[in-house]
């Protein structure tokens, strides 16, 4: 029978009691009020708001807009002086028509611009922009990762980055093509704001789970033995025991039922959030396609679409601003790095020092290193293939905006199906997770290899196959979505098998940084190849190599060995921790004792 809260707690105001009760509080100032339906709605609302940018803008309309704005100001590659056409036809034209016979599709002429005297292909311009944005985003995400889990800034930063990204998209409406450099800056700001805000949004998830009424009830029952501890150690204690630190899973009571309940709820909330975000993205993508057709597929149509995406992002961030509680985290020991007005330095230094310690620990785990190396290449391939394919379809096949948007819709639908179908395929063929990932990689390799077929003379004479006709892009879009659904489902869970128990947050932070940081290289290399050869198709050779390289690395990963090494490292770190030395910190790395005296924001 579940024990009831003590009478002194029941006599207090419910909110005040939950804020003060020692069993539920892991650190002074923690807001342990039960997670409400309204607060969950606020959390879901931001996914509904921002996922539209990731899917519709970054995955489709933003690279097209950047290419078209530079094309409007560029000159033909062939003679370096004839201005490119400022219009983009929506129907087949002289250079894009396909007759009744299967003749090769001839795309619009290649165009270049000059930035600081350097000749850049208009398609490369978009790729370079994304590489720069990912670099800045990665540095920012690492620097503010401590703020995501410590102190009172989590919600404030979330809203600030959301506002920054949404306004950047809204401003596209007022940009004329001659301001294409400013458009690139806005794209960088928007992508940086999106990435940082989603890190902060994800940091709310464990807090919402921990304070769910069902979890709180279970925790109270499981922690009844701690009543004695808190009675003997009143709230005036000046330290928090390392075992209570947020980064570590609270397994001191060996309450596996509590851990399982939290994992189930976390998975449910995360899946719901992803599903809600994708539904919003599909709806907005379809609406944007209709808007583009209604406005005759001009450059203004693209800017209007980005304005709509930014407005959507801004409007649906409002419920998150109203309903999400600040939920302060434990304080960073700023005495080590900065005080007073320089306290913000402590967050940045703490984050980078913590990352370094996690990397040092990861070096002791061979299979973690193999997987992260494979994931570094694979995630770069995933991000690069998407942008490359859209720009190839526009500049080589002459596909109009609506047709390009439809590719993204097909990929999203296929991705949802892939998330479910790979589970069935794995079960049917009795595939281990590592082999399922290998199967996804092999299928992924089909995309660049298929594009390279267009170089073969006899294929070129056919006028079809090898990405010579627009309809082929839809087939490859479906394959891309299917692969992405499988990799998204399996890579994260597979990595979880290889990391030390109880150190999940710090290693998943390294996983996320590897994912985000890798994407700065692929687009830049594709851009350089496009500049060198004057077209995108040769870049498929690089993409084929980029996707192939993770294959042998993934085959070298030994799950049993990885689990054994991870367990040994966890036991060794726990032994060091028990002797009073540093261990692990929340969502980054360093374990430390946090001094009390912290007051967080309370609603």
Swiss-Prot record:
A cellular-component GO term for this protein = vacuolar membrane
Topology in the lipid bilayer is annotated as: Multi-pass membrane protein
Q: Does the keyword Glycoprotein apply?
A: yes
- Glycan attachment residues as annotated in the record: 254, 582
Keyword tags: Amino-acid transport, Autophagy, Glycoprotein, Membrane, Transmembrane, Transmembrane helix, Transport, Vacuole
Membrane-crossing segments per the record: 46-66, 122-142, 157-177, 181-201, 274-294, 304-324, 342-362, 368-388, 401-421, 439-459, 464-484, 539-559
What are the subcellular locations of this protein? Vacuole membrane
Q: Where on the tree of life does the source sit, at the highest rank?
A: Eukaryota
The UniProt entry's GO biological process terms, in alphabetical order, are: amino acid transmembrane export from vacuole; autophagy
The protein's matches in InterPro entries, at most eight in alphabetical order, are given as:
Atg22, Atg22-like, ATG22/LtaA_families, MFS_trans_sf
Establish whether keyword Membrane is in the entry.
yes
The record's similarity note reads: Belongs to the ATG22 family.
Q: What does this protein do?
A: Vacuolar effluxer which mediate the efflux of amino acids resulting from autophagic degradation. The release of autophagic amino acids allows the maintenance of protein synthesis and viability during nitrogen starvation.
What the entry lists under PANTHER family is as follows: AUTOPHAGY-RELATED PROTEIN 22 (PTHR23519:SF1)
What is this protein identified as?
Answer: Autophagy-related protein 22
- Organism equals Coccidioides immitis (strain RS)
């Amino acid at each position: 029978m579940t024990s009831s809260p003590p009478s002194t707690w029941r006599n207090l105001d419910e909110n005040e009691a939950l804020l003060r009760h020692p069993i539920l509080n892991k650190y002074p100032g923690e807001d342990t009020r039960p997670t409400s339906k309204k607060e969950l709605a606020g959390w879901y609302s931001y996914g509904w708001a921002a996922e539209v940018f990731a899917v519709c803008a970054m995955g489709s309309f933003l690279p097209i807009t950047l290419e078209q704005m530079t094309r409007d100001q560029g000159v033909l590659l062939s003679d370096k002086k004839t201005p490119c056409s400022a219009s983009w036809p929506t129907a087949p034209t002289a250079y894009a028509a396909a007759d009744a016979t299967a003749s090769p599709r001839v795309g619009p002429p290649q165009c270049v611009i000059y930035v600081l005297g350097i000749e850049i292909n208009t398609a490369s311009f978009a790729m370079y922009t994304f590489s720069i944005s990912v670099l800045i985003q990665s540095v920012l995400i690492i620097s503010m990762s401590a703020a995501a889990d410590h102190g009172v800034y989590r919600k404030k930063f979330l809203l600030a980055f959301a506002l920054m990204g949404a306004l950047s998209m809204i401003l596209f409406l007022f940009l004329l093509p001659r301001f294409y450099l400013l458009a690139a800056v806005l794209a960088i700001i928007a992508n940086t704001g999106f990435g940082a805000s989603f890190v902060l949004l994800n940091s709310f998830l464990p807090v919402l789970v921990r304070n769910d009424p069902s979890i709180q009830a279970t925790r109270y029952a499981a922690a009844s033995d701690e009543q004695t501890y808190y009675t003997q150690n009143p709230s005036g204690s000046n330290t928090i025991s390392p075992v209570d630190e947020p980064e570590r899973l609270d397994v001191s009571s060996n309450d596996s039922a509590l851990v399982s309940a939290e994992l189930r709820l976390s998975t449910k909330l995360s899946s719901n959030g992803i599903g809600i975000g994708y539904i919003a993205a599909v709806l907005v993508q379809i609406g944007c396609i209709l808007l583009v057709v209604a406005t005759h597929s001009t450059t203004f149509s693209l800017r209007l679409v980005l304005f709509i995406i930014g407005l959507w992002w801004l409007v649906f961030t409002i419920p998150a601003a109203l309903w999400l509680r600040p939920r302060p985290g434990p304080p960073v020991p700023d005495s080590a790095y900065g005080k007073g007005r320089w306290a913000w330095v402590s967050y940045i230094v703490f984050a980078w020092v913590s990352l370094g310690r996690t990397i040092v620990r990861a070096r002791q785990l061979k299979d973690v290193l193999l997987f992260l190396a494979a994931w570094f290449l694979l995630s770069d391939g995933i991000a690069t293939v998407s942008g490359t394919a859209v720009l190839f379809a526009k500049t080589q096949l002459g596909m109009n905006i609506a047709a390009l948007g439809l590719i993204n819709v097909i990929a999203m639908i296929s991705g949802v199906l892939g998330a479910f179908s790979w589970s069935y395929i794995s079960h049917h063929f009795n595939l281990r997770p590592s082999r399922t990932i290998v199967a996804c990689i092999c299928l992924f390799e089909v995309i660049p290899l298929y594009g390279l077929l267009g170089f073969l003379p006899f294929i070129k004479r056919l006028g079809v196959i090898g990405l010579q006709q627009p309809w082929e892009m839809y087939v490859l879009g479906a394959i891309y979505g299917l692969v992405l659904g499988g990799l998204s489902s399996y890579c994260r869970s597979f990595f979880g098998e290889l990391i030390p128990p109880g150190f999940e947050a710090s290693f998943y932070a390294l996983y996320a940084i590897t994912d985000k940081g890798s994407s700065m290289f692929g687009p830049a290399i594709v851009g350089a190849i496009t500049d060198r050869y004057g077209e995108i198709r040769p870049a498929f050779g690089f993409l084929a190599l980029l996707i192939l390289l993770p294959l042998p690395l993934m085959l070298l990963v030994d799950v049993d060995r990885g689990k054994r090494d991870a367990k040994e490292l966890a036991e060794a770190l726990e032994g060091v921790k028990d002797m009073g030395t540093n261990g692990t910190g929340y969502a980054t790395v360093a374990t430390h004792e946090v001094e009390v005296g912290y007051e967080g924001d309370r609603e």
